[in-house]
Amino acid sequence: LFGKSLEWAGVKKEKATLYGGIGSLLFQTYVEVEDGFRASLGFSVSDEVSNFIGAFLPFFKEKFPTLKIVNFKMSAFPSEKFKSGAHRFIVDDYESLYFWLCFDVAEILKLKQLKFWAFDIFDLAIGYSVKEIDWRGNGKRELFLSLDYDLSKIPVRIWFLKQIFALLNYYHLPAPTLQLTPRLKFFIVKI
């Protein structure tokens, strides 16, 4: 979002994605360092590595176009802990958060010859979440396989609408989903 804001301000895309990555990483590192001072959380090296990857993925996609087949998204759905008031903000409740690695199936399978854009917007996503997290960071890991949508591929000519679609593309929208672990379960729609 930092990079997109810089683009809107007239900064060239390559520089905007670099500066956006730096700004994003600084903010996320601040949050991670703050977690380090909380006994119930602590600093997490794996979280910081994930922060780096997420912050600089747009920059690396500009430098290495083959990476455009992959996208990271997130979604949130209030957990029982959040509903009970254990957290003020949903982003502080890791049990409410889902992280998705999305793949551009049409690009991977070289289906670009399809002339109808509606086929091109469907992607495949692998999702991850954790429930019943304890103070040591242990919990029940959940793995999902889901349909995903690449809204940026919907052909629109209105600039503002394109920007809305680009913003929504950071989030995994409700879709049919198969939960793989801890037990196999199908959801007609999962956030």
Where are these regions (language model features)?
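Hydrophobic alpha-helical membrane segments
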Residues: 1-191
